[in-house]
Amino acid sequence: MKTLLKSLKITLAFCVFFSVFYILILWLFAQVAGPNKGNAEVATLEGKVVGAANVGQMFTKDIYFWGRPSSAGDGYDATSSAGSNKGPTNQEYLDEVKARIDTFLVHHPYLDRADVPAEMVTASASGLDPNITPRCAYVQVKRVAQARGLTEEQVRAIVDKSIEKPFLGLLGTEKVNVLKLNIALEESNK
């Protein structure tokens, strides 16, 4: 009985610690050291909020760069954030990827099937990834330039300016935030 009581006390102490104090400590750390104080990075265009730069959004028009597909509900639903849990041997998953490749090629007829970046047809683990690699952005330059009536060089220059380097030059890889890139495109068209 003594052991059971000790175990219950320890369990209760850990429950309180991890459900209250641990979360509070992380929140305080984010408020002090985190980017944007641990809050969403709100993106604006012409003074209007157009989204959060740290959550992916669906772009389907040819005048915009596209992000990765989302497995989070219909169109980047943050309440459904999760991976699809479908593996490369799942026929339904393979059919989805094939359909995404076909759609991508319809909008990028200058590409060969083998040149479609895998990341543009597969969802990220959260289904809400706001970033793509520079390669994925460069693959879309021609389509976006044609749709906007700009030269490829103009659009490529905007992509070049939008590339974010790895944290401290070491952690992670180069990336392009799709929402920020599309905002930069809109601002350049003025």
Where are these predicted regions, by residue range?
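Extracytoplasmic/periplasmic C-terminal soluble domains
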Residues: 139-190
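Aromatic-residue-lined binding/catalytic grooves and analogous aromatic/hydrophobic interfacial grooves
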Residues: 3-18
